Amino acid sequence: MSAKAKILLVNGPNLNLLGRREPGHYGHHTLDSIVQNMKNTANSADVELEHIQSNAEHELIDAIHSTDANFIIINPAAFTHTSVAIRDAILGVAIPFIEVHLSNVHAREPFRHHSYFSDKAVGVICGLGADGYQFALKSAINRLQGPSA
């Protein structure tokens, strides 16, 4: 019997404020509700979902370094535009990943248009709100479980 597939969900700075922080950009869902919905979806697919949210770059890096996950879904938040260190951590562990953003970063301030992750990601989802996380999760599960027999 093969081991259960595992996905690491990484959420960067200020995402702990979802539901009350700039709902025009980020929506009204809390991070807890997004994560719980993802865990329900993962459990239904017999996939384990591990989650970390931190405002501290080194904690995200440590979680990436220590994971035994088969796939990563990451919303680096503000670290998207600044963190070569998190990029290097993901590349260092050689785990495929999908980059997710709640808002459409390309329709916002110019400094948000650049990502240190997008060129290495399997895919990028932005601007679809909380649904983007579900789309990323379903894609990751499909990749891990392969085509149906």
From Swiss-Prot:
- Record keywords: Magnesium included? no
Q: Which domain of life is it from?
A: Bacteria
Q: Into which family does the record put it? A: Belongs to the type-II 3-dehydroquinase family.
Record note on quaternary structure: Homododecamer.
Q: Which NCBIfam families match?
A: aroQ, PRK05395.1-1, PRK05395.1-2, PRK05395.1-3, PRK05395.1-4
Which biological processes are named by the entry's GO terms? amino acid biosynthetic process; aromatic amino acid family biosynthetic process; chorismate biosynthetic process; quinate catabolic process
The pathway it acts in is:
Metabolic intermediate biosynthesis; chorismate biosynthesis; chorismate from D-erythrose 4-phosphate and phosphoenolpyruvate: step 3/7
Q: Which UniProt keywords apply?
A: Amino-acid biosynthesis, Aromatic amino acid biosynthesis, Lyase
Function, as annotated: Catalyzes a trans-dehydration via an enolate intermediate.
In Swiss-Prot or TrEMBL terms, this protein is called 3-dehydroquinate dehydratase
Q: Name one GO molecular function term.
A: 3-dehydroquinate dehydratase activity
Q: Could you confirm whether the keyword Cell membrane appears in this record?
A: no
Species the sequence originates in: Shewanella woodyi (strain ATCC 51908 / MS32)
Q: CDD domains from the entry?
A: DHQase_II
Matching entries from InterPro entries are given as:
DHquinase_II, DHquinase_II_CS, DHquinase_II_sf
User: Residues at site: Transition state stabilizer?
Assistant: R21
- Top EC class of this enzyme: lyase
